[in-house]
């Protein structure tokens, strides 16, 4: 994914963080499809991110082009879930 494409992915998520689908069994992580120039949504990027509500920031965890990989593995998801649990704990302490 080029830097310009990554910028497009980041902007899409930050504009509408609730648009992504919640990933089953992830504790609330979201996955969104983002269209890339000339590829459309089905051939575009996927982004996995952490977002709770307006009181928390959006944290981009992983972005990838569909042509790079179709989806993440269960073990990769488990790592992201552990990280998201740490994020939630840390942000709650700050409030």
Predicted regions and their residues:
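N-terminal first-folded block
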Residues: 1-31
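Amphipathic alpha-helical transducer elements in NTP-driven molecular machines
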Residues: 3-6, 42, 77
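Basic/aromatic recognition patch in beta-strand/loop cores that engages polyanionic ligands
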Residues: 19-64, 68
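Enriched for short, Lys/Arg-rich terminal
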Residues: 51-95
């Amino acid at each position: 994914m080029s830097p310009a494409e990554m910028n497009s992915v980041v902007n899409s998520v930050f504009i509408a963080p609730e648009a992504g689908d919640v990933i089953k069994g992830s504790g609330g992580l979201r996955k969104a499809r983002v269209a890339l120039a000339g590829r459309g949504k089905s051939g575009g990027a996927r982004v996995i991110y952490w977002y709770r509500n307006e009181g928390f920031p959006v944290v981009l965890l992983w972005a990838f082009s569909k042509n790079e990989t179709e989806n993440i593995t269960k073990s990769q998801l488990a790592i992201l879930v552990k990280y998201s649990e740490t994020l939630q704990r840390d942000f709650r302490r700050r409030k």
